[in-house]
Amino acid sequence: MASSSCLWLLALAFLLGSCASLALGHLDPPAPLPLVIWHGMGDSCCNPLSMGAIKKMVEKKIPGIHVLSLEIGKTLREDVENSFFLNVNSQVTTVCQILAKDPKLQQGYNAMGFSQGGQFLRAVAQRCPSPPMVNLISVGGQHQGVFGLPRCPGESSHICDFIRKTLNAGAYNKAIQERLVQAEYWHDPIREDIYRNHSIFLADINQERGVNESYKKNLMALKKFVMVKFLNDTIVDPVDSEWFGFYRSGQAKETIPLQESTLYTQDRLGLKAMDKAGQLVFLALEGDHLQLSEEWFYAHIIPFLE
């Protein structure tokens, strides 16, 4: 009988101690949300000078975070090549499958896309709501596409020469649309009808041919959609595309901001509602394409990942 009383007292003491710990906040802090990264044109998941460095910066400021830098292909070389020549819709489908199978992402994740990876991850948010994306950070992404020839010096320059010639020959040719990544977000403001009818990727995710309510609902589920624009960008044309702006239809000189576009005024994608609710964040910094300092990154990007 005495033994039972002792056990009861021990159990009571443990319970009271647990309650006291709860009251005093002696709980392990929740694990940080995982981060998914998608690199840009001519880059790879793990280049130590680009995405590898970004991964280390995030891990330095957020200990214990799970960072998945997407590799599209079986090798780093294939990853780079696929950023030019693998159908974007196929890439998005593959990424959705990768995310759905990752047990560490099932409670939600943040996403950060660099250059074209920004609009590709937006497509993931719109098409694949499970697991849920919480914050989307687009660093130099081209959300209204481009109408200028890509400049990429160094090892990929010969590939860009080929792309220039191909886009000039016919960006909306069916075979080119199916096989050339940059053609899939090529947006010709002078021939909007041709773009609208023949773009197999950008025109779809931007609701150009009709309103897919699930796209709208899924994008609006984001907590924050952060867009970073590089004010001295020499690669993206027009630069305003990084904030969802673009050329006024019918010409290629004057640009209009997102808020004056049909996409916004008709709220075809939910961006107007998101803007009014404070879900859209527009950040700008001096510098060329993807040129940002550690200090700027820590001050302006890390808060959305913590």
From Swiss-Prot:
Catalysed reactions listed for this entry: S-hexadecanoyl-L-cysteinyl-[protein] + H2O = L-cysteinyl-[protein] + hexadecanoate + H(+); hexadecanoyl-CoA + H2O = hexadecanoate + CoA + H(+); S-hexadecanoyl-N-acetylcysteamine + H2O = N-acetylcysteamine + hexadecanoate + H(+); S-hexadecanoyl-N-acetylcysteine methyl ester + H2O = N-acetylcysteine methyl ester + hexadecanoate + H(+)
First-level EC class: hydrolase
Tissue-wise expression: Spleen, brain, seminal vesicle, and testis. Lower levels of activity in liver, heart, lung, and skeletal muscle.
Signal peptide: 1-27
PTM notes: Glycosylated.
Disulphide bonds in the chain: C45-C46, C96-C128, C152-C160
Transmembrane annotation, as ranges: none
UniProt EC number: 3.1.2.2, 3.1.2.22
GO BP, sorted A to Z: brain development; endocytosis; lipid catabolic process; lysosomal lumen acidification; membrane raft organization; negative regulation of apoptotic process; negative regulation of cell growth; negative regulation of neuron apoptotic process
Effect of mutating I72F: In clone BOVPTT-25
GO MF terms, alphabetically ordered: long-chain fatty acyl-CoA hydrolase activity; palmitoyl-(protein) hydrolase activity; sulfatide binding
Glycosylation sites per record: N197, N212, N232
Summary of activators and inhibitors of this protein: Palmitoylation reduces PPT1 enzymatic activity.
Keywords for this protein: Disulfide bond, Endoplasmic reticulum, Glycoprotein, Golgi apparatus, Hydrolase, Lysosome, Secreted, Signal
Its job: Has thioesterase activity against fatty acid thioesters with 14 -18 carbons, including palmitoyl-CoA, S-palmitoyl-N-acetylcysteamine, and palmitoylated proteins. In contrast to PPT2, PPT1 can hydrolyze palmitoylated proteins and palmitoylcysteine.
Subunit structure as annotated in this protein's UniProt entry: Interacts with CLN5, ATP5F1A and ATP5F1B.
Protein name in UniProt: Palmitoyl-protein thioesterase 1
Organism: Bos taurus
Gene name for this UniProt entry: PPT1
